[in-house]
Structure formats: structure tokens, C-alpha cells
Amino acid sequence: STRWLIRRRINRLIDEISTRLDIQIKPFQLTKRQVLIDRLVYDPKVVEAIQQNAYERNCPREMVQKEVLAYAREIVPSFNAYLYFRIGYWMAKKVARLLYRVRIGTADEQRYASIDPGSTVVFVINHRSNMDYVLVAFLAAEKTTLSYAVGEWAKIWPLQTLIRAMGAFFVRRNSSDPLYRRVLERYVYMATNEGVCQAVFLEGGLSRDGRLRPPKLGFLDYMLRSYDAQSDRDIVFIPVGVNYDRTLEDRTLLRELDPDAEKR
């Protein structure tokens, strides 16, 4: 059938890509999205949070579980290797080279090559521009796929579909809902524990003046809160510094620092 032929072609592409990547695509990334959603909703710590929340609010457990299901559907990506490498990489490469002359200052290839293939690799990156997502994905595509959190600003069609297909996941950065935070925490831990290579922008937002902002450690906490050094795979953190002669948002960001600037 046509579907079988398409599936066979995609599987062949995935095998071809995985053989040339330093960090291979993990089975977790190729698992059907609905399976991951169900796994997240029925995670023991999420189930415990559902019961606690239902008790505190004095409402049916089923109602809280529906909320959790909505959170899980919002968070879990739908990684598509074909879109990532055939469309996403091509677009990232074109846009990056159109706007900038991209250079790599220094990279310790020897140490990178010595990383245990069974480890989870996390790139820890400073955040200068929204172009960071594009640049880092473009530069890393010869070595690995990247999963990272994206704010609600990108939840517009068709951008959100493409972002999910690229393996990224949406987060409500300012949410104080403990139930939502528990679902997000368990997804991040689940992906980390399964070896998914991730990128973390530790500042949690764009630098306004080029200097590093104080770190927000939420995502690192999610990765490590339930970490068991005896049974879980190693996590290797790789620092990445991104810099620009000029960013696309420089005027907007500088205006935010000027108390006398007219608000737009």
C-alpha cells in the first residue's frame, strides 16, 4: 500500500541519518505521540498529583485527569525525522546564512567524541536572540537532533505544527499551577531518562544588553530531581556560547531598558 511504502521510505531515511549522527535518534523520539501522552498521564507521580489536586479542590478525579490530559497534549512533541532533516535543517541553514556569516569560534571535538553513547547530552546555551533556536539546530544537525522548550509566542498555525515535528515542546513559562508544573517536570525527566539530546537556555529569556542574566534552574531541577546516579544514564552538560555582531531584536530589547522610552 501507499502508506506502507511511505513508512518504509521514512524508516530507511531514519536508519541512514542515525548512522551518520554522533548522537543517534532515540527510540523515545520515534514512539507514537499518543503513546507518550498516555505514558505521561499515567506516570505514578502525575497520578499522585491528580489525586492530591482532586482532594484539595474537592472535585472528581476524572475532571483533574482531563486537565492533565490537556497539559500532556500541549507539551508532548511529535518528532518527525523527515521534517527535521529534509525541511527544518534546510530552512535553518538558508535563514542562518542569509542573515549572518556563521562562524564556530572553538569546539573541543576530542572531548565531544569521548562522550559515552549511552549518556544523555544537554547543551546549556546563553540566550541572545530568537535566532538562537535556528542557529543551534543548524550547527548541531550534523551531530544530533535537539529538543528544547519553546514559549507560547510560537503557538500559531502552522508554526506550532512544524515546531512539534522538530521535536520541540511548548511551555507556559509563567505558570504557577503546581499540577501543570508536575506534568512538565515528569515529561522533561522522562525525555532526559530516555537519552533525548536537549538544549536548555538557562537564562529563561533573552538578554536585554548582551550580558548573561541570572540563571533560572527550573529545567535542570526537573532533569535532576528524580535522578538516580546508580540506575539512570549519565547526563553530560555541554556549555555553548552564542554571540552576534547585531541581533534582530536589538532595538526592541534596548528600549525595554530605557525607562523613558515610549511603550509600543
Predicted regions and their residues:
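A cross-family acyltransferase "interaction/gating" segment
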Residues: 1, 5, 13, 28, ...
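Membrane-anchoring hydrophobic helices of lipid-metabolizing enzymes
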Residues: 1-122, 129-138, 160-167, 185-187, ...
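Short, flexible loop segments at the rims of nucleotide/cofactor-binding pockets, characterized by
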Residues: 97-103, 125, 148, 175-179
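Generic beta-sheet signal
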Residues: 119-125, 196-200
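Non-catalytic terminal/interface segments that mediate subunit docking, oligomerization
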Residues: 123, 127, 139, 148-152
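Gly/Ser/Thr-rich loops at beta-strand to alpha-helix junctions
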Residues: 128-131, 205-207
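Short, well-ordered alpha-helices that flank and scaffold nucleotide-derived cofactor binding pockets
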Residues: 138-141, 225
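Hydrophobic residues at beta-strand termini and immediately following loops
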Residues: 171
